[in-house]
Design a protein with these regions (language model features):
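Basic, Lys/Arg-enriched alpha-helical interface segments
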Residues: 1-164, 171-193
Length: 193
C-alpha cells in the first residue's frame, strides 16, 4: 500500500536525480574543458534568457523547477556575463530540488552544500530586504503574493554583469523549486541595485 507507493516515488526521485546529476557533470565539464576535447557546431547561449530557455526545454530539469513569468522577465533583462557558471548553478538547483523531496530532516543548507550550491545558496533574504525592499522579492504563486526569500547569488557585485540572483521557494505539494525572481540582485542592506 502506502509503503510501496513511497518506495516507487523514492525510486523515481533517485532516477531523476541521476539524470540531473549527469547534466550537472556535463555542465561542469564545460566549465573546465578537457584540452583534447573539441566540440564543433554547438551554439552556446549568448544571454541569461537563452540559458534559462534551454533548461526549461529539458524535461528532467523542468520536472524539478518551475519558472514564473516574473523570473523569465528578469532573465530577459539580465546582462550577466558568465553564462556557463549560470547554467551550472541552475542545473544544480534542479538536483537540489530532487534531493529536498526525499531528504526531510536534513537542513536545506546541508543539501545545498551536497549539491554544489554551498557558496551561493541562502535560505532567506535579510529582514531589511524583506520589509523595506519587499517589492524586489515578491512574485505571485498559487494566487497569492509571496516573498521568494530562498536564493542563489552568483557573483558578489553591484555590477549586474557580474552578479546574478535567482529567488525561489520549495513547493511541498509539487516537490519543485519555483523561481519567482531572477536576474539582477535586489535591494538589501549591502547593495544599492
Amino acid at each position: 500500500g502506502t509503503k510501496k507507493l513511497w518506495i516507487e516515488s523514492a525510486n523515481r526521485d533517485a532516477d531523476l536525480a541521476l539524470k540531473v546529476t549527469k547534466k550537472i557533470d556535463e555542465a561542469q565539464a564545460e566549465l573546465t574543458p578537457d584540452t583534447d576535447l573539441v566540440i564543433e557546431d554547438r551554439k552556446e547561449p549568448s544571454s541569461a534568457i537563452e540559458v534559462l530557455e534551454e533548461l526549461m526545454a529539458d524535461p528532467a530539469w523542468s520536472s524539478c523547477v518551475t519558472v514564473l513569468p516574473s523570473a523569465i522577465k528578469g532573465a530577459e533583462e539580465s546582462v550577466f556575463a558568465n553564462l556557463k557558471q549560470l547554467k551550472t548553478y541552475l542545473l544544480r538547483l534542479a538536483s537540489f530540488a530532487a534531493a529536498r523531496r526525499t531528504r526531510r530532516g536534513t537542513t536545506n543548507e546541508a543539501i545545498a552544500e551536497e549539491n554544489g550550491l554551498g557558496g551561493v545558496y541562502r535560505r532567506a533574504v535579510s529582514f531589511t530586504a524583506e520589509t523595506k525592499y519587499a517589492e524586489d522579492y515578491i512574485a505571485r504563486w498559487n494566487g497569492a503574493a509571496r516573498i521568494f526569500g530562498e536564493h542563489l547569488t552568483v557573483g558578489f557585485s553591484v555590477n549586474n554583469a557580474r552578479c546574478f540572483s535567482a529567488h525561489f521557494l520549495f513547493d511541498q505539494h509539487s516537490g519543485k523549486i519555483v523561481i519567482g525572481r531572477m536576474g539582477k540582485h535586489g535591494c538589501c542592506t549591502r547593495s544599492n541595485s
